[in-house]
């Protein structure tokens, strides 16, 4: 029996307010009818990081207009929807609550079913939205607030192989940019500087490569960079443009080498299951880094595994991924209703021990 489902998704777990409409017909690839994102970079730039209270107020102010714009772009009304999906965690609790309250209001007014979505599941299921790949696949979520290796086995079934025990790589990129006086967000700024630098001039540590597991650590890289910067300033009285470029190149090379080696270990564990179509998918803002993508692509070629990276707009936080993850849950019969609550922490793999630490852009899960 052919069925067409249309869902509205809401996302407000950090510093992006987003709404989107996704539609899927049985047997066909899902289609993004609209995707609206309001960023908050300017609101937080003076503070060196996301301020939860400011973020929550901005979400509350923008969610209604986000929903209106998403419906208008899709050419639909609330009456054309089958359900509403909303990020219910993990994330900054004030922002998550704003989204959940907005979704509950729409559900109460329209009678639409309400479906809570794990923000990380939204990222993890994005490859199925963009490329309709089959389970199981290996997911590397690498962003400002998270870094995890997950085997996606179903819309709500994930096995975590490892993750960061302290800071996320995106947080390390942002801190590096601040230490070197580069613009935020740090990822693009550091990458741009690194293109003109020598990655061999400054040798950064490759954290935890002496361990056989898939866990990562990035806090030590920030400390190493700060010490190198301070030493240069003490010796020369300041940093030249070339000093900055070389520091960025060395730092980025350490991130790439660490991720490639840890991903090699995660892929070997994943491939033990002998998946029919072996695939490594990456998502999160840091996945936009060209050197990281190139390193992972070369690794996948070596291990005869497909490599998939969604478009940048779907790597960073967005509501299309939430709508699609909600659509997958909807098809399993999941409904949450008014009992849905916001959750600051929400691990995808409940059987794995908790990861240590909390990133600048939200709690680790």
From Swiss-Prot:
Region Disordered, annotated ranges: 341-365
Documented EC number(s): 2.3.1.234
Binding site for Fe cation: 119, 123, 317
GO terms assigned for molecular function: iron ion binding; N(6)-L-threonylcarbamoyladenine synthase activity
UniProt cross-references to InterPro entries, sorted A to Z: ATPase_NBD, Gcp-like_dom, KAE1/TsaD, TsaD
Cofactor: Fe(2+)
Binding-site residues for substrate, renumbered to this chain: 141-145, 174, 187, 289
Its biological purpose: Required for the formation of a threonylcarbamoyl group on adenosine at position 37 (t(6)A37) in tRNAs that read codons beginning with adenine. Is involved in the transfer of the threonylcarbamoyl moiety of threonylcarbamoyl-AMP (TC-AMP) to the N6 group of A37, together with TsaE and TsaB. TsaD likely plays a direct catalytic role in this reaction.
Name the record gives this protein: tRNA N6-adenosine threonylcarbamoyltransferase
Organism (species): Ruegeria sp. (strain TM1040)
